[in-house]
Curated annotation (Swiss-Prot):
Its EC number is 2.1.1.74. GO terms for cellular component: cytosol. Gene3D superfamilies: FAD/NAD(P)-binding domain (3.50.50.60). Belongs to the MnmG family. TrmFO subfamily. GO terms for molecular function: flavin adenine dinucleotide binding; tRNA (uracil(54)-C5)-methyltransferase activity, 5,10-methylenetetrahydrofolate-dependent. Keywords: Cytoplasm, FAD, Flavoprotein, Methyltransferase, NAD, NADP, Transferase, tRNA processing. GO terms for biological process: tRNA methylation; tRNA wobble uridine modification. This is Methylenetetrahydrofolate--tRNA-(uracil-5-)-methyltransferase TrmFO.
Length: 434
């Protein structure tokens, strides 16, 4: 048993997971979280693992790479996935959570661990000794400056945008219908169908609506998975019809026909009183935002309880700076985790924290840090962000394209994905007790 302490900076998804993994291995953790002493532009509470974008952790099935990464994490006792499973709300084939219950549960599990000491203060310098930096996309300016000095690399800037949340009672239920795309899983989404004329009116208003201005020195680089709806719309009138307003598989039961466009609403809390507008992340000003959203059939009188907002996201050039153990190449006892590493998504961020935490604990115990094979979802993510072309490095979600190729080619997509999943879960069993 070592008497050394690991400092974990940031109690988001990655930091909470890292702290838990280190603590459960018998090592003391000092977990630093600047909230509520200092807030970020996107957070609203002092809870750990607060979800600031969607409340969905995405697909839960093993034919999807993010479903595989979740199952790997379950088997490795992820505190984030355990809390998510316990706080889930209906979402078809996806794992969505009541965001308030989820954050409270993660906070409880991590804070109450006897090996975790929570420090509510801002860290402005990179500490000496074993450290995991998991400060996320909204790293404070002081620490960001230190990290820039440490790495010698310029940061990249892009923006994630959060979708509006509305009260269910303000939805005109006579104009919407309950259905999941292609009837997969339970009917979990409220669907707002649009005619071509309704879509065109909506589109024209969206394109003309005023957005919150960005600072001149910041480049607009959006990650495709969380792109503001107005930026997507600016690419062309048809773009939304192949994105968040895609109507295929969502036939209107009243007409038996597929609408011209569909806006989907997903349950956001366990009580089913709040719904978020799927894929409608935005940084429109609040007045125009309400006017545009009320052009959606069924939302004419929508009460918006949280407007869509936009915030900066920051990540390092991991191919140049990190090993697949999440260690900094030039300092063995310094680890990075979460979106700062260029993994994109809630689950991927937590997964990086899980592996960084395990390896920080192993380092203190005098054991070799683990590199997970790229036949696993977690290993494929770590491999990608540390070995891809550094020149054009961009954030990446979990996907089967990152996995090591199968020994035998399989033509059918579902069978191929099942083979990836089977191989990954068989392999991860060798690491569940590390």
């Amino acid at each position: 048993m070592t008497t050394q302490v690991v400092k974990v900076i940031g109690a988001g998804l990655a930091g909470s997971e890292a702290a838990y993994q280190i603590a459960k291995r018998g090592i003391q953790v000092h977990l630093y979280e600047m909230r509520p002493v200092k807030q970020t532009p996107a957070h609203h509470t002092d809870k750990f693992a607060e979800l600031v974008c969607s409340n969905s952790l995405r697909a839960n099935t093993l034919t999807n790479a993010v479903g595989v990464i979740k199952e790997e994490m379950r088997r490795m006792d992820s505190v984030i996935i355990r809390a998510a499973d316990e706080c889930s709300v209906p979402a078809g084939g996806a794992l969505a959570v009541d965001r308030h219950e989820f954050a409270a549960k993660v906070t409880e599990y991590v804070k109450n661990h006897p090996n975790v000491t929570v420090m509510n203060e801002e860290i402005t310098e990179i500490p000496e000794g074993p450290t995991v930096i998991a400060t996320g996309p909204l790293t404070s300016p002081a620490l960001a400056a230190q990290l820039k000095e440490l790495t010698g690399e310029e940061y990249f800037y892009f923006y994630d945008a959060a979708a509006p949340i509305i009260e269910k009672d303000s939805i005109d239920m006579n104009k919407v219908y309950l259905k999941s795309r292609y009837d997969k899983g339970e009917a979990a989404y409220l669907n707002c169908p649009m005619t071509e004329d309704e879509f065109n009116r909506f589109y024209d208003a969206l394109i003309a609506a005023e957005t919150v201005p960005l600072k001149e020195f910041e480049k607009e680089i959006f990650f495709e998975g969380c792109m503001p709806v107005e930026v997507m719309a600016a690419r062309g009138r048809q773009t939304l019809l192949f994105g968040p307003m895609k109507p295929v598989g969502l036939e209107d039961p009243k007409t038996g026909k597929t609408p011209y466009a569909v806006v989907q609403l997903r349950q956001d809390d366990a009580a089913g009183t709040l719904y978020n507008i799927v894929g409608f992340q935005t940084h429109l000003k609040w007045g125009p935002q309400k006017e545009v959203l009320q052009l959606i059939p069924g939302l004419e009188n929508a009460e918006i309880v949280r407007y869509g907002v936009m915030h900066r996201n920051t990540f390092i050039n991991s191919p140049k700076l990190l090993r697949p153990t999440y260690q900094y190449k030039h300092r063995d006892d310094l680890f990075f985790a979460g979106q700062m590493t260029g993994v994109e998504g809630y689950v991927e961020s937590a997964a990086s924290g899980l592996l960084a935490g395990i390896n920080a604990a192993r380092l203190l115990k005098g054991e070799e840090p683990v590199v997970l094979p790229s036949v696993t979802a977690m290993g494929s993510m770590a491999n990608y962000i540390t070995s891809t072309n550094a020149k054009n490095f961009q954030p990446m979600n979990a996907n089967f394209g990152l996995f090591a190729p199968l020994e035998k080619k399989i033509k059918k997509k579902q069978e191929r994905n099942e083979a990836y999943a089977t191989r990954a879960l068989e392999t991860i069993q060798n690491f569940v007790n590390i």
